[in-house]
Swiss-Prot record:
Shikimate binds at residues 18-20, 65, 90, 105, 224. Homodimer. Pathway: Metabolic intermediate biosynthesis; chorismate biosynthesis; chorismate from D-erythrose 4-phosphate and phosphoenolpyruvate: step 4/7. Involved in the biosynthesis of the chorismate, which leads to the biosynthesis of aromatic amino acids. Catalyzes the reversible NADPH linked reduction of 3-dehydroshikimate (DHSA) to yield shikimate (SA). One of its GO terms (biological process) is shikimate metabolic process. It catalyses: shikimate + NADP(+) = 3-dehydroshikimate + NADPH + H(+). This is Shikimate dehydrogenase (NADP(+)). Belongs to the shikimate dehydrogenase family. One of its GO terms (molecular function) is NADP binding. Gene3D superfamilies: Leucine Dehydrogenase, chain A, domain 1, NAD(P)-binding Rossmann-like Domain.
């Protein structure tokens, strides 16, 4: 690391798998920015101390992954509207003695759907599968795209209803119908289905019936790699267009880079390079 390079990192547990250092290194090259970005494995009970240490080292910003997104929102000095709505943060900006929290997950998802996949969300019917932290982090930005309807389903119906209730005011403002449906029998089909669960990791079946799909629906899994494959295979077998969350990963990173550096890096070439690297076993 050169003396002029600003320090950034991603904090999580586990963290060894993170592609973020590679992504941000490419962003820095493409935008001629001088920075150093590293992984930091944080003890489960040591997140607050890790933030203090990072700030003391002169750190300028960090990405936050599981399981610290809720704690990141709580420990920040200021919070964006997205963080206030989601209750979780994936991006921190250090400025003097203050820490500003933001959440770029939903922005990344929206960018990958509308630009990467070329599927508009305005006026469309969207099914959000899951009501945990991943779903909460993206519902606000999805609503801001003015879809006709967003339905939320979850194994625990009360959690789906709670997520709907927490976003009801924004939905009314956007004139979008927002409701919770029965996961096993939603009774409707959708243009876009977003899987925000870890069903594949848990070895379970796809959590919704094929009746939710329309011909040509976009079925999007927020995960990527082997974790997303069962959902993607299911979607393809039923005639949907399947897309994993690798583009979301790159796009949310680009939004974080914009917050830190004031310039949004080109995401398409970085995503293309990343897919090629993963396909080659890197």
């Amino acid at each position: 690391m050169t003396a002029a390079a600003d320090l950034y990192c991603v904090m999580g547990n586990p963290i060894a798998h993170s592609r973020s250092p590679w992504i941000h290194a490419r962003f820095a090259q493409l935008t001629d920015q001088s920075l150093h970005y590293e992984r930091r494995l944080v003890p489960l009970d040591g997140f607050a101390q890790a933030l203090q240490s990072f700030a003391a080292e002169g750190g300028r910003g960090c990405n936050i992954t599981v399981p610290f997104k809720l704690e990141a929102a709580q420990l920040a000095t200021t919070r964006s509207e997205r963080v206030q709505l989601a209750g979780a943060a994936n991006t921190l900006v250090f400025d003097g003695g203050s820490i500003h929290a933001d959440n770029t997950d939903g922005l990344g998802l929206v960018a990958d759907i509308t630009q990467g996949a070329g599927v508009p969300l305005a006026g469309r019917d969207v099914l959000l599968v899951g009501a945990g932290g991943a779903a909460a982090g993206v519902l606000g930005p999805l609503l801001r795209q003015h879809p006709r309807r967003i339905a939320v389903v979850n194994r625990t119906p009360a959690r789906a209803q709670a997520l709907v209730d927490s976003h009801a005011a924004l939905a009314a403002l956007q004139k979008t119908e927002l409701l919770a449906l029965d996961m096993q029998a939603p009774g409707a089909d959708f243009d876009v289905i977003i899987n925000a669960t870890a069903s594949s990791l848990e070895g379970g079946p796809v959590p919704v019936p094929a009746s939710v799909l329309r011909p040509g629906s976009l079925a999007y899994d927020m995960m990527y790699g082997p974790a997303a494959q069962p959902f993607l295979d299911w979607a393809s077998a039923h005639g949907a267009t399947a897309r994993d969350g690798l583009g979301m990963l790159v796009e949310q990173a680009a939004e974080a880079f914009l917050l830190w550096r004031g310039v949004r890096p080109p995401s398409a070439p970085v995503l293309q390079e990343l897919r090629a690297a993963i396909a080659a076993g890197a």
